[in-house]
Regions:
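A conserved beta-strand-loop-helix scaffold within acyl/acetyltransferase catalytic domains
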Residues: 19, 96-178
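Conserved glycine-rich acetyl-CoA-binding loop
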Residues: 1-4, 8-9, 178-187
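Active-site/acyl-donor-binding loops of N-acyltransferases
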Residues: 13-87, 136, 146, 152, ...
């Protein structure tokens, strides 16, 4: 299906600016009518300081105004400082009812029911029905996802979907709590941090849009650090809006 054909069927399209291709893909998409909408945020809770050292260095070394040896030294120093910060804010081990499932064993109907009962709390977002999750998560051949489910009195009240990336960090793909309850989110995040520690995983992380108010609040409460915001402060370079949206002319919106 071509883009012109798709425009007749759908009203909104989402894509990225193509940062890997040095922005070339983003330039093409803007010519098609996409609008730069938001920047990416990358939240991290560090368990092993070497992970953050490598992460900071990988971002700073691409900034030409900072010499490579300074980027390396600065990354090492900052990761050491941050390791003390994360130790100070390491959460108590949660005592709730948590159950971990592989992607082929998760109770999909329970998850869909939780979503249907609470989707009004989450605004415009993907519809987390079991059919979508099976396609997006369970049938994804590139990642081995794990479902972490939180129960209270044998009733599902929240979940997180995570995968282990190539840098030995848990990446949160999705997280949801009944009534968007922050106390439930806090318990889930605490469990993920301890789950990572016990499994020898270096960090818990989540990549999302900077403007996602719910996730920003969740990760701020739980003392995660937005690496992209930190890099922006060090380099004094404003974050580019790499998330692009195409709106059908039928939709009235303010740009």
């Amino acid at each position: 299906m071509s883009f012109e054909e798709a425009k007749k069927r759908f009203q909104i399209f989402f894509t990225t600016a193509g940062d890997v291709a040095k922005g070339a893909a983003g330039a093409v998409r803007r010519k098609l009518g996409y609008v730069a909408f938001d920047s990416w945020a990358y939240y991290v809770f560090l368990i092993n300081k070497d992970y953050l050292n490598n992460l900071l260095f990988s971002r700073l070394k691409n900034f030409r105004r900072i010499p490579l040896f300074i980027s390396r030294t600065l990354s090492a120093a900052l990761s050491t400082l941050f390791s003390y910060y994360f130790k100070m804010h390491f959460p108590p081990k949660p005592v709730g009812d948590f159950r971990v499932f592989g992607k082929n064993d998760a109770p999909m109907q329970e998850i869909e029911d939780l979503w249907e009962q609470n989707k009004t709390y989450y605004g415009i977002t993907v519809d987390r029905k079991s059919r979508y999750l099976k396609w997006r998560i369970n049938q994804n051949p590139y990642f081995d996802y794990v479902y972490v489910l939180n129960y209270k009195e044998n009733r599902l009240v929240g979940y997180a979907i995570i995968s282990l990336n190539h840098n030995n960090a848990f990446l949160i793909e999705d997280i949801l709590a009944e009534k968007s309850d922050m106390s439930i989110f806090d318990e889930i995040i605490s469990y993920l941090i301890w789950y990572a520690k016990d499994a020898g995983v270096a960090a818990v992380s989540c990549g999302t849009l900077e403007g996602n108010a719910i996730l920003k609040s969740i990760f701020a409460r739980n003392k995660f650090v937005d690496v992209e915001a930190f890099r922006s402060r060090i380099t004094r370079k404003e974050r580019s809006k790499e998330f692009h949206v195409f709106f059908s002319p039928e939709i009235k919106c303010k740009q």
